[in-house]
Amino acid sequence: MYKKFFMGIAAMAALTLVSCSSDDLNSLSDNSSKNEAISFDGYLGRSAVAVNGSRGSELTKDALQKSEEGFGVFGNYTATDVTTTTYGENWFKNQQVTYKTSAWTYNPLKYWLPEGHIDFLAYAPYAKNTALTESKINFTVADQVGNQKDLLWANATNKKKADKTVTFTFNHALAKIGYTVKTNVVGTFTTITLNKITLAGSADGKKNAFYTSGTIDLSKVNKATDLWTNFEGKQNFTWFNGTQNLTSTSVSNSNYLFVIPQDFSDAASDDLYVIVDYTINYNTGAAATMTSQVSSKITKKFEQGKAYTINLTIGLTPIEFNADVTEWEIPTDGAIDIDSWN
């Protein structure tokens, strides 16, 4: 029998953002009605919807509000009212903001000054050791799929006392990749068991593919082509490792990859392969078990804020029969004459 392996990618465009409300922070001021605490509100992006109608896990408003990390904020104060944007951390230095009861809170509270403005940068989820260089932070993609984070970023410029609440519109900074898997084998005599799925930079898995780390500019707008720079290192990912009997119905997995945007198209220098290990069990009169590995090259540019699905179909080439019958051969001496009987 010959093995067959098919792969398809469904690209999904990011949707518009959905809002989440919050009340103004309760002021812990010095009883001066002239001082107003700087409070925060956030709008959270949601995952894309596939063109075929399937849906990935959604980063909802509740998810961010219930998270222990919340989001981190950098804020830079300028004493004049000029509209010049100056990013930094002289007012907020990686301040953690979390949701409690009905509001986004932080401690210690800081207050608006009568004059000047503040330029804000934000990211989520918050990480204690995140350092700001100008308007940029470094980000490392976790090597274990289950530990990867859906990085968000936002900015809000030229904010003054009259604004009261600083509202962030967060965008997805990474590309999200999911997969479905099924078999085209129909019948009761053969079982296909999935053992492993790997994404690598070569068909043999020896070359690494995905960026390990990069630098994101929090001051950039959504879809900016120069959002990411300073890529370092490469790594592969083991997407699945276990046993899963396949059927003709596609099964999706919740272990999404969150990766730095990267170009694996034909014109790019980077390569990406999906490698699948599986077991074939024959339950006919002559029972047999064998393992197999197949691979396929993925030529796709994975873009920021977009979700993708790799559709895998694992199967066998069925044994088929055909029949033909040769024509009767008429020999030259095929005629047998019998003398007549008198």
Locate predicted features.
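Sec-type signal peptide cleavage vicinity
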Residues: 2-342
